[in-house]
Amino acid sequence: ATSNYIVKFNDNLNILNFHENIYKNKIVYKKNLFIPKSILNNFNNSIIFQNNDFIVINKWAQIATQGGSKINISIDHIIKNISPNYRLVHRLDKETSGLLIIAKNLNNAKLFSNLFQQKNITKLYLALCEGNPKLHQSQVSLDITNKKLKLDNTLTNYKVLNTKNGISQIMFNPKTGKTHQIRIVSKNLGSPIIGDNKYN
């Protein structure tokens, strides 16, 4: 076709070498964001379950779940390049690895959100922490200051699974979902998470 040809309904378009040139090494995202092939491979390799409704990945550490002013690439960026219908159901901190649910459409995202709100999904986190809490199993009620400088009441169950050489493996079961809840609770226990530069 010539450069001044106007595309009409039912026209067939053929873009030469489209997949080879566009998708061989990267995928284009809105605002000119490019997702390197290596990161796409990481995402595909992280999938541990998938059906027609949702995906479960084992999110690797050091990638953000959502974008932000200082975030170049996030899981949200990646899934939006795969399909604009994909939706995050919950989030994990950038430094945290673990299971992350991705709904394949808005309706399924709402279903999962309701399951989380109704406490029908149990969240369990494992962390290596410094020291050894006085109580090896307990429930912590703690007020945490949020971004609006208001107090949020949090509730967290924890259990020490193993201790060795001044390090404890602790399982946390947060009953509320506040920002940095587990990190703040572990610090309050006197056993901050190893490698947590913000709360250690």
Question: Where are the regions a protein language model picked out?
Answer:
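RNA pseudouridine synthases
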Residues: 1-200
